[in-house]
Amino acid sequence: MTDGATVLVDFFYAQPVGHAVEALHHALAVQRADPSRRVSVLLNAATPVELASCCPWLDRAYAVRSPFLEPAPDALAALAHVPRDWDWVLDDPRRHQPVQRESFAGMVDHYAASDAWLRPREGRRPLGYPPPSRSRHEPLRLELPAAARAAAAGRLPGRGGPLVALLPAGSGPAAQYPSARSWGLVLDALREALPGLGVVLVGRRVRDERTSTGMPAADLARLAAHPAVVADVLDVPLLEQLAAVQRCGLLLSPHSGFGMAAMAVGTPWLTLSGGRWFEWWFDHVPFRSVVPDVRRFPAYSQFGAEATVPDGDGGERVPSMVRERVQADLHRVVAAADELLRGAVPYERCLDDYVRDLVAAHGGDASALWSFDDVHREHLPGRLGG
Protein backbone atom coordinates (compact mmCIF):
# COMPACT_ATOMS: atom_id res chain seq x y z
CA MET A 1 0.00 0.00 0.00
CA THR A 2 1.37 3.41 -0.98
CA ASP A 3 0.73 6.73 0.71
CA GLY A 4 2.15 9.33 -1.72
CA ALA A 5 3.36 11.38 1.23
CA THR A 6 5.58 14.44 1.04
CA VAL A 7 8.53 14.00 3.40
CA LEU A 8 11.25 16.44 4.44
CA VAL A 9 14.42 15.04 5.97
CA ASP A 10 15.65 17.95 8.09
CA PHE A 11 19.34 17.15 8.54
CA PHE A 12 21.09 20.33 9.62
CA TYR A 13 24.41 19.09 10.95
CA ALA A 14 28.17 19.60 10.63
CA GLN A 15 29.87 20.25 7.29
CA PRO A 16 31.85 17.02 6.64
CA VAL A 17 31.01 15.08 3.48
CA GLY A 18 29.97 12.01 5.45
CA HIS A 19 27.04 13.79 7.07
CA ALA A 20 25.62 14.72 3.66
CA VAL A 21 25.94 11.06 2.65
CA GLU A 22 24.25 10.04 5.90
CA ALA A 23 21.34 12.42 5.25
CA LEU A 24 20.87 11.12 1.72
CA HIS A 25 20.92 7.53 2.96
CA HIS A 26 18.15 8.34 5.45
CA ALA A 27 16.12 9.94 2.67
CA LEU A 28 16.67 6.90 0.45
CA ALA A 29 15.45 4.54 3.18
CA VAL A 30 12.16 6.45 3.41
CA GLN A 31 11.72 6.71 -0.36
CA ARG A 32 12.50 3.05 -1.06
CA ALA A 33 9.93 1.93 1.50
CA ASP A 34 7.27 3.65 -0.65
CA PRO A 35 8.40 4.91 -4.08
CA SER A 36 5.23 7.00 -4.36
CA ARG A 37 6.61 9.36 -1.73
CA ARG A 38 8.15 12.69 -2.64
CA VAL A 39 11.17 12.90 -0.36
CA SER A 40 13.28 16.04 0.00
CA VAL A 41 16.28 16.85 2.17
CA LEU A 42 17.39 19.95 4.07
CA LEU A 43 21.15 20.34 4.51
CA ASN A 44 23.62 22.77 6.01
CA ALA A 45 24.70 24.95 3.06
CA ALA A 46 28.33 24.46 4.13
CA THR A 47 28.11 20.72 3.43
CA PRO A 48 28.40 19.30 -0.14
CA VAL A 49 24.79 19.82 -1.18
CA GLU A 50 25.74 18.92 -4.77
CA LEU A 51 25.72 15.25 -3.75
CA ALA A 52 21.92 15.50 -3.77
CA SER A 53 22.07 16.11 -7.54
CA CYS A 54 23.43 12.56 -7.86
CA CYS A 55 20.22 11.10 -6.40
CA PRO A 56 17.55 11.09 -9.16
CA TRP A 57 14.99 9.59 -6.76
CA LEU A 58 15.20 12.68 -4.52
CA ASP A 59 12.55 15.37 -5.04
CA ARG A 60 14.39 18.48 -3.82
CA ALA A 61 17.37 19.59 -1.75
CA TYR A 62 17.23 22.75 0.36
CA ALA A 63 20.51 24.36 1.42
CA VAL A 64 20.18 26.39 4.63
CA ARG A 65 22.91 28.94 5.31
CA SER A 66 23.09 29.41 9.07
CA PRO A 67 25.80 29.02 11.74
CA PHE A 68 26.25 25.55 13.17
CA LEU A 69 28.75 26.01 16.00
CA GLU A 70 27.84 29.54 17.03
CA PRO A 71 24.38 30.86 17.99
CA ALA A 72 22.13 31.54 14.99
CA PRO A 73 19.80 34.44 15.83
CA ASP A 74 18.58 34.55 12.20
CA ALA A 75 17.83 30.83 11.97
CA LEU A 76 14.15 31.41 11.24
CA ALA A 77 14.88 33.83 8.39
CA ALA A 78 17.30 31.28 6.91
CA LEU A 79 14.34 28.92 6.39
CA ALA A 80 12.24 31.34 4.34
CA HIS A 81 12.87 29.44 1.07
CA VAL A 82 11.86 26.06 2.54
CA PRO A 83 8.17 25.13 2.02
CA ARG A 84 6.28 25.03 5.30
CA ASP A 85 3.75 22.27 4.65
CA TRP A 86 4.69 18.59 4.52
CA ASP A 87 3.05 15.31 5.44
CA TRP A 88 6.06 14.27 7.50
CA VAL A 89 9.15 16.03 8.81
CA LEU A 90 11.94 13.69 9.94
CA ASP A 91 14.98 15.10 11.69
CA ASP A 92 18.40 14.08 12.96
CA PRO A 93 18.13 12.41 16.40
CA ARG A 94 21.35 14.18 17.41
CA ARG A 95 19.30 17.32 17.99
CA HIS A 96 18.05 15.74 21.22
CA GLN A 97 21.40 14.49 22.57
CA PRO A 98 22.75 16.59 25.47
CA VAL A 99 26.39 16.44 24.29
CA GLN A 100 25.35 17.74 20.86
CA ARG A 101 23.14 20.49 22.27
CA GLU A 102 25.92 21.65 24.58
CA SER A 103 28.45 21.73 21.73
CA PHE A 104 26.54 23.15 18.76
CA ALA A 105 24.50 26.26 19.56
CA GLY A 106 23.63 26.92 15.92
CA MET A 107 22.17 23.44 15.56
CA VAL A 108 19.94 24.07 18.58
CA ASP A 109 18.77 27.37 17.10
CA HIS A 110 18.10 25.79 13.71
CA TYR A 111 15.84 23.11 15.11
CA ALA A 112 13.98 25.58 17.32
CA ALA A 113 13.31 27.68 14.22
CA SER A 114 12.44 24.60 12.16
CA ASP A 115 9.91 23.47 14.77
CA ALA A 116 8.23 26.86 14.48
CA TRP A 117 8.42 27.16 10.68
CA LEU A 118 7.47 23.71 9.38
CA ARG A 119 3.90 22.42 9.55
CA PRO A 120 3.84 18.62 9.20
CA ARG A 121 0.33 17.22 8.77
CA GLU A 122 1.09 13.71 10.01
CA GLY A 123 3.86 14.45 12.47
CA ARG A 124 7.50 15.21 13.16
CA ARG A 125 9.73 12.35 14.27
CA PRO A 126 13.42 11.46 14.65
CA LEU A 127 14.93 9.61 11.70
CA GLY A 128 15.02 5.86 12.20
CA TYR A 129 11.86 5.72 14.30
CA PRO A 130 8.85 4.92 12.06
CA PRO A 131 6.29 5.93 11.06
CA PRO A 132 6.61 6.58 8.24
CA SER A 133 8.04 3.26 7.10
CA ARG A 134 11.64 2.94 5.96
CA SER A 135 13.64 0.29 4.13
CA ARG A 136 16.63 -0.98 6.08
CA HIS A 137 20.23 -1.33 4.83
CA GLU A 138 19.49 -0.04 1.34
CA PRO A 139 22.55 0.46 -0.89
CA LEU A 140 23.08 4.14 -1.67
CA ARG A 141 24.62 4.82 -5.08
CA LEU A 142 25.51 8.30 -6.23
CA GLU A 143 24.99 8.71 -9.98
CA LEU A 144 27.83 11.01 -10.98
CA PRO A 145 27.24 13.33 -13.95
CA ALA A 146 28.83 12.47 -17.28
CA ALA A 147 30.87 15.69 -17.28
CA ALA A 148 32.50 14.78 -13.95
CA ARG A 149 33.30 11.27 -15.17
CA ALA A 150 34.79 12.60 -18.40
CA ALA A 151 36.90 15.14 -16.54
CA ALA A 152 38.21 12.44 -14.19
CA ALA A 153 39.10 10.18 -17.10
CA GLY A 154 41.15 13.00 -18.59
CA ARG A 155 43.04 13.58 -15.35
CA LEU A 156 44.11 9.97 -14.77
CA PRO A 157 46.84 8.29 -16.79
CA GLY A 158 46.09 5.36 -19.05
CA ARG A 159 47.99 2.44 -17.51
CA GLY A 160 47.75 -1.27 -16.88
CA GLY A 161 48.35 -1.50 -13.13
CA PRO A 162 45.83 -1.01 -10.34
CA LEU A 163 45.02 2.46 -9.06
CA VAL A 164 44.62 3.35 -5.39
CA ALA A 165 43.16 6.68 -4.31
CA LEU A 166 44.83 8.13 -1.20
CA LEU A 167 43.19 10.66 1.10
CA PRO A 168 45.92 11.22 3.72
CA ALA A 169 43.78 13.10 6.26
CA GLY A 170 40.21 13.91 7.13
CA SER A 171 39.03 17.38 8.05
CA GLY A 172 40.23 17.46 11.67
CA PRO A 173 43.53 18.82 13.03
CA ALA A 174 46.71 17.35 11.54
CA ALA A 175 47.52 15.63 14.85
CA GLN A 176 44.58 13.27 14.26
CA TYR A 177 46.15 11.73 11.16
CA PRO A 178 49.42 10.07 10.08
CA SER A 179 52.28 12.28 8.99
CA ALA A 180 53.44 12.53 5.38
CA ARG A 181 56.47 10.45 6.35
CA SER A 182 54.24 7.71 7.75
CA TRP A 183 52.16 7.69 4.58
CA GLY A 184 55.40 7.43 2.64
CA LEU A 185 56.14 4.19 4.49
CA VAL A 186 52.71 2.89 3.50
CA LEU A 187 53.21 3.80 -0.15
CA ASP A 188 56.67 2.22 -0.16
CA ALA A 189 55.21 -1.02 1.20
CA LEU A 190 52.32 -1.05 -1.28
CA ARG A 191 54.64 -0.34 -4.20
CA GLU A 192 56.94 -3.18 -3.20
CA ALA A 193 54.14 -5.71 -2.66
CA LEU A 194 51.95 -4.73 -5.62
CA PRO A 195 54.10 -4.09 -8.71
CA GLY A 196 52.58 -1.64 -11.15
CA LEU A 197 50.39 0.03 -8.54
CA GLY A 198 49.71 3.72 -9.02
CA VAL A 199 48.38 6.17 -6.44
CA VAL A 200 45.96 9.04 -7.06
CA LEU A 201 46.15 11.73 -4.38
CA VAL A 202 42.81 13.29 -3.40
CA GLY A 203 42.00 16.11 -1.00
CA ARG A 204 41.08 19.76 -0.62
CA ARG A 205 43.46 22.55 0.42
CA VAL A 206 41.03 25.46 0.10
CA ARG A 207 40.11 27.02 3.46
CA ASP A 208 36.52 28.24 3.44
CA GLU A 209 33.18 27.30 5.00
CA ARG A 210 33.54 23.74 3.76
CA THR A 211 35.86 21.18 5.25
CA SER A 212 39.38 20.74 3.92
CA THR A 213 42.11 18.15 4.26
CA GLY A 214 43.79 18.35 7.66
CA MET A 215 47.37 18.06 6.39
CA PRO A 216 49.71 21.01 5.80
CA ALA A 217 50.13 21.99 2.16
CA ALA A 218 53.88 21.27 2.30
CA ASP A 219 53.20 17.71 3.45
CA LEU A 220 50.63 17.19 0.69
CA ALA A 221 53.24 18.38 -1.81
CA ARG A 222 55.73 15.92 -0.32
CA LEU A 223 53.27 13.09 -0.79
CA ALA A 224 52.45 14.18 -4.33
CA ALA A 225 56.16 13.79 -5.16
CA HIS A 226 56.28 10.16 -3.99
CA PRO A 227 57.26 7.78 -6.84
CA ALA A 228 54.04 5.79 -6.40
CA VAL A 229 51.83 8.83 -7.08
CA VAL A 230 50.82 8.96 -10.74
CA ALA A 231 48.20 11.74 -10.50
CA ASP A 232 46.53 14.08 -8.08
CA VAL A 233 43.07 15.59 -8.10
CA LEU A 234 43.67 17.96 -5.20
CA ASP A 235 41.20 20.85 -5.16
CA VAL A 236 39.18 19.78 -8.19
CA PRO A 237 35.39 19.85 -7.64
CA LEU A 238 34.06 17.15 -5.34
CA LEU A 239 32.06 15.29 -7.99
CA GLU A 240 35.16 15.09 -10.21
CA GLN A 241 37.22 13.78 -7.28
CA LEU A 242 34.59 11.12 -6.65
CA ALA A 243 34.62 10.23 -10.34
CA ALA A 244 38.40 9.78 -10.10
CA VAL A 245 37.97 7.60 -7.00
CA GLN A 246 35.34 5.58 -8.86
CA ARG A 247 38.03 4.68 -11.43
CA CYS A 248 40.33 3.38 -8.66
CA GLY A 249 40.38 -0.08 -7.13
CA LEU A 250 40.08 1.30 -3.62
CA LEU A 251 40.31 4.41 -1.47
CA LEU A 252 42.94 4.37 1.30
CA SER A 253 42.49 6.86 4.14
CA PRO A 254 42.12 7.35 7.87
CA HIS A 255 38.56 7.71 9.15
CA SER A 256 36.80 10.30 6.98
CA GLY A 257 33.33 10.95 5.66
CA PHE A 258 34.89 11.04 2.19
CA GLY A 259 35.28 7.28 2.56
CA MET A 260 31.51 6.99 2.82
CA ALA A 261 31.14 8.95 -0.41
CA ALA A 262 33.70 6.64 -2.05
CA MET A 263 31.63 3.59 -1.15
CA ALA A 264 28.52 5.38 -2.41
CA VAL A 265 30.14 5.41 -5.88
CA GLY A 266 31.01 1.72 -5.52
CA THR A 267 34.71 1.96 -4.56
CA PRO A 268 36.02 -0.25 -1.72
CA TRP A 269 37.37 1.64 1.30
CA LEU A 270 40.53 0.64 3.16
CA THR A 271 40.74 2.57 6.42
CA LEU A 272 43.71 3.02 8.70
CA SER A 273 41.24 3.08 11.55
CA GLY A 274 41.76 4.99 14.77
CA GLY A 275 41.50 8.53 16.04
CA ARG A 276 38.22 9.66 17.59
CA TRP A 277 35.74 7.69 15.55
CA PHE A 278 35.34 4.13 14.35
CA GLU A 279 33.72 3.29 11.02
CA TRP A 280 29.94 3.00 11.38
CA TRP A 281 28.49 3.18 7.85
CA PHE A 282 28.25 0.17 5.55
CA ASP A 283 26.89 0.19 2.00
CA HIS A 284 27.15 -3.27 0.44
CA VAL A 285 30.66 -2.47 -0.84
CA PRO A 286 33.67 -4.50 0.38
CA PHE A 287 35.85 -2.63 2.86
CA ARG A 288 38.60 -3.18 5.38
CA SER A 289 39.22 -1.21 8.56
CA VAL A 290 42.63 -1.89 10.09
CA VAL A 291 41.77 -1.52 13.78
CA PRO A 292 44.74 -0.58 15.99
CA ASP A 293 45.98 -2.51 19.01
CA VAL A 294 44.33 -0.14 21.46
CA ARG A 295 46.42 -1.45 24.35
CA ARG A 296 49.44 0.15 22.69
CA PHE A 297 47.69 2.81 20.63
CA PRO A 298 44.48 4.02 22.32
CA ALA A 299 41.67 5.16 20.01
CA TYR A 300 37.95 5.87 19.63
CA SER A 301 37.56 8.56 22.29
CA GLN A 302 34.57 10.07 20.39
CA PHE A 303 33.55 13.18 22.37
CA GLY A 304 35.95 12.39 25.21
CA ALA A 305 39.34 13.95 25.86
CA GLU A 306 42.01 12.94 23.37
CA ALA A 307 45.66 13.18 24.39
CA THR A 308 48.54 13.47 21.95
CA VAL A 309 51.97 11.88 22.25
CA PRO A 310 55.33 12.59 20.60
CA ASP A 311 55.57 11.12 17.12
CA GLY A 312 58.76 9.83 15.57
CA ASP A 313 58.48 12.62 13.02
CA GLY A 314 59.09 15.43 15.47
CA GLY A 315 55.51 16.48 16.18
CA GLU A 316 52.64 15.38 18.40
CA ARG A 317 49.91 13.04 17.26
CA VAL A 318 47.06 10.98 18.70
CA PRO A 319 48.46 7.57 19.73
CA SER A 320 46.71 5.57 17.00
CA MET A 321 48.26 7.69 14.24
CA VAL A 322 51.93 7.80 15.27
CA ARG A 323 54.60 6.33 13.01
CA GLU A 324 55.17 3.36 15.34
CA ARG A 325 51.54 2.33 14.95
CA VAL A 326 51.66 2.72 11.17
CA GLN A 327 54.78 0.56 11.02
CA ALA A 328 53.17 -2.07 13.25
CA ASP A 329 50.21 -2.42 10.88
CA LEU A 330 51.97 -2.09 7.51
CA HIS A 331 51.58 -5.80 6.77
CA ARG A 332 47.85 -5.64 7.52
CA VAL A 333 47.36 -2.61 5.26
CA VAL A 334 49.19 -4.32 2.40
CA ALA A 335 47.26 -7.57 2.82
CA ALA A 336 43.94 -5.72 2.93
CA ALA A 337 44.80 -3.68 -0.16
CA ASP A 338 45.76 -6.81 -2.05
CA GLU A 339 42.52 -8.66 -1.28
CA LEU A 340 40.32 -5.65 -2.02
CA LEU A 341 42.06 -4.98 -5.33
CA ARG A 342 41.62 -8.65 -6.29
CA GLY A 343 37.97 -8.64 -5.24
CA ALA A 344 38.79 -11.56 -2.98
CA VAL A 345 36.72 -10.66 0.07
CA PRO A 346 32.90 -10.53 0.13
CA TYR A 347 31.02 -7.73 1.86
CA GLU A 348 29.48 -9.92 4.56
CA ARG A 349 32.88 -11.26 5.56
CA CYS A 350 34.19 -7.70 5.78
CA LEU A 351 31.42 -6.92 8.25
CA ASP A 352 32.05 -10.09 10.27
CA ASP A 353 35.78 -9.40 10.57
CA TYR A 354 35.44 -5.71 11.32
CA VAL A 355 32.77 -6.06 13.99
CA ARG A 356 34.82 -8.80 15.67
CA ASP A 357 37.90 -6.56 15.73
CA LEU A 358 35.94 -3.54 16.92
CA VAL A 359 34.30 -5.43 19.77
CA ALA A 360 37.74 -6.65 20.84
CA ALA A 361 39.06 -3.07 20.72
CA HIS A 362 36.26 -2.09 23.12
CA GLY A 363 37.23 -4.79 25.60
CA GLY A 364 34.45 -7.11 24.48
CA ASP A 365 31.75 -4.52 25.23
CA ALA A 366 29.50 -4.50 22.17
CA SER A 367 27.16 -2.01 23.84
CA ALA A 368 29.72 0.70 23.04
CA LEU A 369 29.18 0.22 19.29
CA TRP A 370 26.67 1.80 16.93
CA SER A 371 26.12 1.91 13.18
CA PHE A 372 23.72 3.22 10.57
CA ASP A 373 20.61 1.02 10.65
CA ASP A 374 22.31 -1.02 13.42
CA VAL A 375 23.86 -3.19 10.70
CA HIS A 376 26.68 -4.25 13.03
CA ARG A 377 24.28 -6.09 15.35
CA GLU A 378 23.82 -8.92 12.86
CA HIS A 379 27.58 -9.49 12.84
CA LEU A 380 28.40 -9.50 16.54
CA PRO A 381 30.61 -12.38 17.71
CA GLY A 382 28.40 -15.31 18.64
CA ARG A 383 25.84 -14.39 16.00
CA LEU A 384 28.01 -15.01 12.97
CA GLY A 385 26.40 -17.25 10.44
CA GLY A 386 22.91 -16.88 11.84
Please place each PLM-identified region on the residue numbering.
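Generic beta-sheet signal
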Residues: L42, V64, D92, V202, ...
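Hydrophobic anchor at the start of a short beta-strand
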Residues: S36-S40, L163, L197-V199, P268-L270, ...
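A structural signal for short coil/turn segments at secondary-structure junctions
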Residues: D34-P35, P56, R159, L194, ...
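Active-site and donor-binding regions of nucleotide-sugar-utilizing enzymes
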Residues: T2-R119, E240-L242, G259
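Active-site donor-nucleotide binding/catalytic segment of nucleotide-sugar enzymes
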Residues: L8-F11, D92-V108, A151-A218, G275-W277, ...
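Donor-binding and catalytic core of enzymes assembling or modifying cell-surface/extracellular glycoconjugates
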Residues: T47, Y177-G275, E279
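Conserved nucleotide-diphosphate donor binding/catalytic pocket of glycan-assembly enzymes
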Residues: L58-A150, G160-A169, P173, R276-V285, ...
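Leloir-type glycosyltransferase catalytic cores
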Residues: P120-R155, V285-G386
